[in-house]
């Protein structure tokens, strides 16, 4: 595996944060049947895949049409990543099963697909990792394939959310989320 592929894999794993989305998934879908949770997980991954592949395909074109160069986007993205990282590291630990927030509409779309799986950090990452002026089409296709792998792993984490949460425990899930936050902070600078 080349250095770029390894870097892209780690970056995608960190910004998508498959383990970190498990507590949220339990909070919003934990009351559903196993079949409904699989359906919600599948929809969330499908929607996230479409969003991220649209940005792989036309994200750079849209930025250029808006007059935003990738260097500026990289700086802005780094700042966004830093803010997200700080939130991940400094958030209060809580039991996601005790979260009684109201759920409106399709939870696969919001909050799962957007903003948690295909959020600002993921979108920024895929646009930068598939820069048409820097990377060959082959490298961009490899990065897209890595995205599919990470989203597949995320689907597995969502479908096995109860197991993952039992394995890690609430404390472990919170620790994993904070470690991901520190990694995101390191990527941001």
Located regions from the model:
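Transmembrane helix exit motif
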Residues: 80-100, 187-189
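Membrane interface segments of multi-pass transport proteins and intramembrane proteases
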Residues: 67-71, 156-176
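Small-residue-enriched transmembrane helix starts and helix-helix packing motifs
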Residues: 1-15, 91-92, 96-113
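A small-residue-rich subset of transmembrane alpha-helices
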Residues: 34-60, 133-166
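Structural signature of hydrophobic alpha-helical transmembrane segments
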Residues: 4-21, 70-81, 141-154
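Generic transmembrane alpha-helix signature in multi-pass membrane proteins
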Residues: 13, 22-28, 110-115, 123-132
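Juxtamembrane transmembrane-helix termini in multi-pass membrane transport proteins
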Residues: 4-54
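Membrane helix-loop-helix hairpins that form the core translocation module of multi-pass transporters
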Residues: 38-89
């Amino acid at each position: 595996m080349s250095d770029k592929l390894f870097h892209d894999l780690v970056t995608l794993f960190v910004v998508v944060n498959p383990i970190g989305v498990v507590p949220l998934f339990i909070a919003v879908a934990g009351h559903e049947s196993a079949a409904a949770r699989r359906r919600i997980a599948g929809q969330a991954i499908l929607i996230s895949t479409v969003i991220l592949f649209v940005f792989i395909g036309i994200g750079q074109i849209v930025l250029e049409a808006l007059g935003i160069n990738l260097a500026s986007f990289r700086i802005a993205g780094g700042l966004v990543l830093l803010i997200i990282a700080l939130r991940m590291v400094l958030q209060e630990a809580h039991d996601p099963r005790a979260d009684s927030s109201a759920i409106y509409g399709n939870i696969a779309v919001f909050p799962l697909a957007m903003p948690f799986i295909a959020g600002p950090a993921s979108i920024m990452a895929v646009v930068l990792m598939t820069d048409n002026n820097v990377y060959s089409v082959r490298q961009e296709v490899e990065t897209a394939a890595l995205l599919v792998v990470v989203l597949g792993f995320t689907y597995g984490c969502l479908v096995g959310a109860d197991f993952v949460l039992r394995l890690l425990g609430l404390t472990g899930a919170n620790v994993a989320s904070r470690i991901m936050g520190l990694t995101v902070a390191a990527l941001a600078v």
